[in-house]
Amino acid sequence: MSGEIIHSVNPANELGEGIVWDHRSQTLLWTDIHGKKLFRMQWYNFEVTETSVPERLCAFGLTENPEKLIAAFETGFAYFSPATGEIKWLHKTYDVDTPQIRLNDGRMGRDKRFWVGSIVEDDTAPKAKLYALSPNGALNVYRDKIAIANGLGFSPDGQYIYFTDTPNQQIEVSKLTEPLKWHPFATTETHAYPDGATVDKEGNLWSAEWGAGRVTAYRPDGTVILRYPIPATQPSCCTFAGPDLKYLCVTSARVGLSETQISENPKEGSMFILKTDFAGLPEVLFPEKTL
């Protein structure tokens, strides 16, 4: 049945995020940002391993080298080798000693650039940015005056980019030309804050809704197709996975929840796998020529 949860993993993530499917190894990867851990799940047996990281790992993409990730740590962009722990810094964007702002949500674009937005963690003036890291190493800023950058996704033909500044509760879309020109795509309900997102093979946008305990699927025209309930208060990110890319995998978070809320629902902070009637797209690989 579409939307049925077939499996869940409960590592009690403080802030599960950045979930990515690696079709080459048939593994699912995600991060617990605040827990400073990278998780990897083998699809064939659901076995999960975890790797500690030296600073908060906020988002990552796959590269043409299966042993390396293109990573957005809290302070900047780097190549990261999970097996060895090696980090090769490319750009430092923030200072770990001034934690009011850090990198946050990120996705590989169809244009082979690694797009990442940042977040203001102390609720001061919106001063976060949207970055794109090119294969030649160039880092460009495409938007500023952001509070919490989230919801990055790309149409299958690579013509459009989706984005949300979460507190505004509005998903936006722009044609992927320079300069980007943003237009309203969808507005969420009062209790639903759009977080991480993914786009399926048909061009539908799937948005994890923090605070609403669900994932909402939108057609390319912004109308709602369906909503899948998630047994966690704060779904945070999603992606399609599995050999046929027909399973929607959703991370969640415990951060900000009370001890009572967690005791009443121990699945808070879990990663959920749902069977769907939709199919995702393989991840774009960051080119190896710069590795």
Label each region the model flagged:
Residues 11-25, 54-70, 96-113, 142-160, ...:
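Beta-rich, blade/repeat-based domains predominating
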Residues 4-10, 46-52, 88-96, 138-144, ...:
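A short beta-strand motif characteristic of beta-propeller blades
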Residues 85-142:
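Hydrophobic alpha-helical segments and helix pairs
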Residues 37-39, 76, 128-131, 170-172, ...:
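A short loop-to-beta-strand structural motif that recurs across blades of beta-propeller domains
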Residues 239-291:
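Blade-level signature of beta-propeller repeat domains, shared across WD40, Kelch, NHL, RCC1
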Residues 170, 186-223:
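Loop/turn-rich, solvent-exposed surfaces of beta-rich toroidal or solenoidal domains
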Residues 22-23, 28-34, 70-75, 116-124, ...:
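Conserved beta-strand positions in repeat-built beta-propeller and related beta-rich domains
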Residues 42-46, 81-85, 133-137, 175-179, ...:
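Short loop/turn segments that connect beta-strands within beta-propeller blades
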